[in-house]
């Protein structure tokens, strides 16, 4: 019995070993055949990705590597086991492939590279990376490449014609703040083009909501404000932001200097449009807005805010719109401007503000505001 049992164990071991060898053979042979299919232009074992066929996110090749293996996915072979020498080597090779993928995209995204300007075919590959990849570092590098190329006027049309606008806009749904910021930067560069603006207007509400709800003074918030500022350079799409003006004043009141200045650039675009005057006057402003003039605030911030007030005052016909003034609620910008004389008296005081230019501009604005708001009292 002992001998028969020993023979049985040996036989079983041989069968299991042969089976394992055969499985490894099939796996390696399958990978080789799949690579040959892809090298010949076929889809391999990956389903066709529509317009991105032949340029999927795992087809990006590194100029420094002769291999056509996938470099954007960290792929661990079935035989890679933790704690084994073979597994350690396999994982090291997988990490190396991922690193090469990142460098391959970043090489083209680098401003110091000679390959900064991509051809339409290369832009198509980068767009496919953005569309198909789920790896944050791949998305980040690809979006940097797109952002750099979108800075060139001739590439803005190419990226649009390749279907890049909805591809990049879809990334706005991500929760990764770094990736979202890069997507906003790409859209900001693309929005300089008039046709791109026409197509991007459908995303303005989403960008606006994300901007006002993002962490205060964050990179995502600033990138969103820059995009909205670009989208409101012309008067055509400013009405989309009419319901968010109060939120912008809230950001202005609570934000740091950089956030304040970016909000003011956006509000200045709106203030230059006479059609947006009523929306601006009806917006709720924080009570802390008046205290801005009581302290030694940044000079540029106060001067830009006064420029906004001047544009609103010039565009609003106070005497003609006297019946409509009853529609403005307490706490609105309209009532703030009516009571601006109180703030101005403090600013004009010698001890209130150290900058002579600010005090002069405040004095001129108050005089102009009084003449426009209370013309009958001047008679």
Swiss-Prot record:
Give me the ranges of the annotated region Mitochondrion outer membrane (MOM)-targeting sequence: 1-6, 26-37
Positions of ARM repeats = 111-151, 153-192, 233-272
Q: Which SUPFAM superfamilies match?
A: ARM repeat
Record GO cellular component, one term = mitochondrion
Against Pfam families, the record matches this protein to:
Arm_2 (PF04826)
Membrane topology type, per the record?
Answer: Single-pass membrane protein
Cytoplasmic side of the membrane: what ranges?
A: 30-379
| Compartments where located | Mitochondrion outer membrane; Cytoplasm; Nucleus
Topological domain ranges for the Mitochondrial intermembrane compartment: 1-6
GO BP, one annotated term:
mitochondrion organization
Gene3D superfamilies in the record: Leucine-rich Repeat Variant
Q: Where is this region: Disordered?
A: 34-69
Q: Which UniProt keywords apply?
A: Cytoplasm, Membrane, Mitochondrion, Mitochondrion outer membrane, Nucleus, Phosphoprotein, Repeat, Signal-anchor, Transmembrane, Transmembrane helix
Region listing for Nuclear localization signal, in residue ranges: 89-98
Segments passing through the bilayer: 7-29
Q: Which residues carry this modification: Phosphoserine?
A: 61, 67, 72, 110
Q: How does it assemble?
A: Interacts (via ARM domain) with MIRO1, MIRO2 and TRAK2. The interaction with Miro is calcium-dependent. Interacts with Sox10.
Family membership = Belongs to the eutherian X-chromosome-specific Armcx family.
Q: What does this protein do?
A: Regulates mitochondrial aggregation and transport in axons in living neurons. May link mitochondria to the Trak2-kinesin motor complex via its interaction with Miro and Trak2. Mitochondrial distribution and dynamics is regulated through Armcx3 protein degradation, which is promoted by PCK and negatively regulated by Wnt1. Enhances the Sox10-mediated transactivation of the neuronal acetylcholine receptor subunit alpha-3 and beta-4 subunit gene promoters.
Protein name per UniProt: Armadillo repeat-containing X-linked protein 3
What is the native source organism of this protein? Rattus norvegicus (Rat)
The major lineage groups are: Eukaryota, Metazoa, Chordata, Craniata, Vertebrata
């Amino acid at each position: 019995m002992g001998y028969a049992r020993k023979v049985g164990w040996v036989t079983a071991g041989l069968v299991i070993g042969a089976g394992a060898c055969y499985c490894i053979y099939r796996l390696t042979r399958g990978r080789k055949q799949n690579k040959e299919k892809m090298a010949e232009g076929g889809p391999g074992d990956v389903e066709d990705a529509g317009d991105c066929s032949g340029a999927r996110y795992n087809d990006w090749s590194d100029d420094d590597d002769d291999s056509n293996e996938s470099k954007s996915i960290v792929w661990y072979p079935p035989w890679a086991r933790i704690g084994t020498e073979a597994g350690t080597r396999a994982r090291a090779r997988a990490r190396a492939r991922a690193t090469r993928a990142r460098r391959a995209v970043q090489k083209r995204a680098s401003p110091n590279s000679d390959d900064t300007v991509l051809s339409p075919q290369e832009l198509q590959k980068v767009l496919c990376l953005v569309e198909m990849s789920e790896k944050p570092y791949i998305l980040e590098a690809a979006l940097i490449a797109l952002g750099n190329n979108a800075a060139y006027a001739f590439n803005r049309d190419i990226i649009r014609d390749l279907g890049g606008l909805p591809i990049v806009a879809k990334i706005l749904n991500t929760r990764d703040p770094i990736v979202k910021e890069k997507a906003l930067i790409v859209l900001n560069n693309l929005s300089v083009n008039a046709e791109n603006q026409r197509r991007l207007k459908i995303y303005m509400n989403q960008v606006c909501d994300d901007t006002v709800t993002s962490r205060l003074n964050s990179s995502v918030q600033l990138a969103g404000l820059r995009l909205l500022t670009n989208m409101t350079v012309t008067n055509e799409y400013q009405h989309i932001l009419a319901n968010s003006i109060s939120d912008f004043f809230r950001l202005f009141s609570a934000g740091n200097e950089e956030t304040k200045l970016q909000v003011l650039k956006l509000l200045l675009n709106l203030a230059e449009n006479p059609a947006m005057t009523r929306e601006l006057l009806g917006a709720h402003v924080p009570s802390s807005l008046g205290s801005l003039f009581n302290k030694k605030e940044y000079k540029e911030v106060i001067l830009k805010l006064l420029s906004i007030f001047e544009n609103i005052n010039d565009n609003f016909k106070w005497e003609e719109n006297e019946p409509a003034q009853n529609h403005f609620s307490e706490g609105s910008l309209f009532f703030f401007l009516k009571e601006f004389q109180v703030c101005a008296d403090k600013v004009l005081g010698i001890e209130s503000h150290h900058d002579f230019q600010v005090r002069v501009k405040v004095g001129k604005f108050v005089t102009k505001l009084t003449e426009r708001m209370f013309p009958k009292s001047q008679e």
